[in-house]
């Protein structure tokens, strides 16, 4: 079991991982590719101490290189959901299940807006993971809404199991989509159905489907971990980066403004030190109960 699972391999997550590793904890980072960090897109950064004029890509390469050099394990994968398990948490990492005593959420700004019907039909036709739920739609019609070329992998897999796959790209250039998939360039408006999904309403038409796969880089934090207190899009934390759930911390852009690397890195370090204290207290408690 991991001591600390970190969700997001941006500045906040990597900063937390480095300090966690130095404090001898079993730490692992689960993150989308480096290029999805917000800072990767910055042309030039002049306000991070010691790195004047660096590009976002260079900064991320340095941060990631530093983490790897001291032995931090980084798994490039998306965390789909986190379930509380008494004194630990179970992570669904693209259908691989990993248990951790503590969790640090460092997932950046949730770039996704919620589609009408998304909450209502989640688990009843709406899914965030093709690998996890694809087999349930064998022989059926589904639609995939993708916000980047990464979603094309999921759609291609669904084309192998589903009777019909529609694909709605929320970006311009398609990269490697299977030819069996029908591309629909229209804005999704609303997921419809009675008890389960029956279709997707678009700007000028609608699709009759049993499944709606929403494949985006980030999953709203409130969806990632049920019961997590949020304030709008931001995870609610105190000064020690503790959330309302025991053993769960948050750091960086996902806790709200200001959106700055220095703040993300500082919060990552605060969060992990708090996780270390929590783990040490857990260990003492376990020893007393032996
Ligand atoms: C164009 C631009 C220029 C900027 N310039 C500056 C600047 O000059 N100075 C400055 O201080 N700040 C700048 N910023 C802000 C800075 O980028 C952010 O404050 C910083 O990246 C926050 O770090 P973070 O780790 O919290 O989030 P991010 O860097 O966004 O990293 C979060 C990571 O988590 C991943 N993730 C999300 N959900 C999941 C999941 N479920 N499973 C796995 N991974 C997940 C994301 O894909 C992403 O890789 C700029 C931002 C932009 C967009």
Where are each of the predicted segments found?
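Short, well-ordered coil/turn residues at beta-beta hairpins
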Residues: 8, 106-107, 145, 213-216, ...
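Beta1-alpha1 glycine-rich phosphate/pyrophosphate-binding loop at the start
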Residues: 2-58, 66, 140-174
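Glycine/small-residue-rich loop that forms an oxyanion/phosphate-binding "nest" at active or ligand-binding sites
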Residues: 74-138
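FAD-site-proximal beta/loop scaffold in flavoenzymes
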Residues: 114, 120-136, 216-263, 267-273, ...
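Phosphate-coordination loops involved in phosphoryl transfer and adenosine-cofactor binding
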Residues: 1-3, 76-77, 138-140, 245
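A Rossmann-like FAD-binding core segment of flavoenzymes
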Residues: 67-86, 90-92, 98-100, 160-239, ...
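Short loop/helix-cap segments at secondary-structure boundaries that form the rim of catalytic
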Residues: 39-41, 115-119, 135-137, 173-180, ...
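Glycine-rich nucleotide phosphate-binding loop and flanking beta-alpha elements
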Residues: 13, 81, 110-111, 151, ...
